[in-house]
Design a protein with these regions (language model features):
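Catalytic loop of short-chain dehydrogenase/reductase
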Residues: 78, 82, 86-97, 116-167
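Conserved glycine-rich Rossmann-like NAD(P)H-binding loop of the short-chain dehydrogenase/reductase
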Residues: 24-39
């Protein structure tokens, strides 16, 4: 049985990823800040675990509660209070980076000892086309072309960190996924994709074997070249 941890798993992309991986036979621990929001994940058969990626103690306790870990899905993210340069300030950048980047690294570092014991350790970091310069500059790309400066910058860091972890941990399969413009709370449900479509890349990467890709960036149609 494959044991998986999904962060931000109480709703949206995280909840749908949880549903699909349970259907694929995984035992899924659904990380969320507030266990009171865990009913939907629990009904799917997931095991809710209190996990605030911004709090080291919470992360340590969550990871410490896992018997083993084969797959880590870093999905938790926030937009933050700023969208354009007009209202951009350091605090807005800090809020986005605290959860989307520092929180991801906090979880990864805590989870590495468990992942290293797995016979097929896999990590998927959920990125965004907003953090991928080539997509932002491509008029044919269907990503949301809003500004969201702090969020976009943080997701660029997620993609780069994914490559760095993959280079430094060649025994693991570590990749980033691009959900595309998906209808979630994060964009007030304005996205044109369903959460199922938005989790296609994440789920596919979560299911790869030891000979699968690493250090890559994938959308729902496959690999996106850097």
């Amino acid at each position: 049985m494959t044991t998986t941890l999904v962060t931000g798993a109480n709703k949206g992309l995280g909840l749908e990823t949880t549903r699909r991986l349970i259907a694929a036979g995984h035992t899924v621990y659904a990380g969320m800040r507030n266990l009171d929001t865990g009913d939907a994940a629990r009904e799917l058969g997931a095991i809710p675990v209190q996990l605030d990626v911004n709090e080291q103690d919470s992360v340590d306790k969550a990871i410490g509660s896992l018997p083993e870990l084969d797959v880590l899905i870093n999905n938790a993210a926030v937009v933050g209070p700023s969208w354009t340069l007009d209202d951009l300030d350091i605090e807005a950048m800090r809020i986005a980076f605290e959860t989307n980047v520092f929180g991801m690294v906090r979880v990864i570092q805590a989870a590495l000892p468990l992942l290293k014991r797995s016979s097929n350790p896999v990590m998927v970091n959920v990125g965004s086309g907003l953090g991928f310069p080539r997509a932002l500059l491509d008029p044919e790309d269907d990503s949301f072309h809003g500004y969201m400066v702090p969020y976009a910058s943080s997701k660029a860091a997620v993609i780069t960190l994914t490559v760095q972890y993959a280079k430094n941990l060649p025994q693991m399969r570590i990749n980033a996924s691009d959900p595309g413009y998906t209808s979630t709370d994060l964009n007030s449900h304005k996205g044109h994709q369903t959460v199922t479509e938005g989790t296609d890349a994440t789920v596919a990467l979560a299911l790869i074997g030891p000979d699968g890709p690493t250090g890559e960036y994938h959308g729902r149609k496959g690999r996106i070249e850097y």
